[in-house]
Amino acid sequence: MNIKPASEASLKDWLELRNKLWSDSEASHLQEMHQLLAEKYALQLLAYSDHQAIAMLEASIRFEYVNGTETSPVGFLEGIYVLPAHRRSGVATMLIRQAEVWAKQFSCTEFASDAALDNVISHAMHRSLGFQETEKVVYFSKKID
């Protein structure tokens, strides 16, 4: 297995995996992907097996308060996706470890993430990667008249 940073040359592979994780339009994904590639505090990794992209990870450095953490800045897992045939093979663990090494370069001592309340598959994955649940939050909004 080979893990490498995403680049302009790997946009097609990254987009294919990203579409499986988040259901935005291709144009929206591509616009955000180009922005992320230029962002100093963003990391995008792709894992390959036999020249096929099998997993992706997106992480960032967050300087604002991150729920459940005690320090700042914090490495933050924005998203991770592994093709079903390659799950439970250790690829997600390898991606997370590389993201943690990257986050340490920014003096991070914590790595955080979030998941929807009803996404129990994501909760299980986070636990298997060493994350601990810290709190549950429900966000509210209201239109101002």
From Swiss-Prot:
**Pfam families from the entry?**
Acetyltransf_1
Binding positions for substrate per the UniProt entry: W22, Y65, E78, D114, E135
Question: For this protein, what is any one GO molecular function term?
Answer: aminoglycoside 6'-N-acetyltransferase activity
Task: Please provide the record's keywords in A-Z order.
Answer: Acyltransferase, Antibiotic resistance, Transferase
One GO BP: response to antibiotic
Which EC number applies? 2.3.1.82
| Catalyzed reaction equations | kanamycin B + acetyl-CoA = N(6')-acetylkanamycin B + CoA + H(+)
UniProt KW Acyltransferase keyword: yes
Top-level taxon of origin: Bacteria
Q: Where is the signal peptide?
A: none
Question: Where does the chain bind acetyl-CoA?
Answer: I80, Y81, V82, N119
Query: What range(s) does the N-acetyltransferase domain occupy?
Result: 1-145
Identify which top EC class this enzyme belongs to: transferase
The cross-references to PANTHER family, in alphabetical order and at most eight, read: ACETYLTRANSFERASE (PTHR43420), PEPTIDYL-LYSINE N-ACETYLTRANSFERASE YIAC (PTHR43420:SF51)
- Functional summary from the UniProt entry: Catalyzes the transfer of an acetyl group from acetyl-CoA to the 6'-amino group of aminoglycoside molecules conferring resistance to antibiotics containing the purpurosamine ring including amikacin, kanamycin, tobramycin and netilmicin.
Subunit architecture:
Homodimer.
State the protein's name. Answer: Aminoglycoside N(6')-acetyltransferase type 1
**Species assigned in the record:** Acinetobacter haemolyticus
Q: What is the lineage of its organism?
A: Bacteria, Pseudomonadati, Pseudomonadota, Gammaproteobacteria, Moraxellales
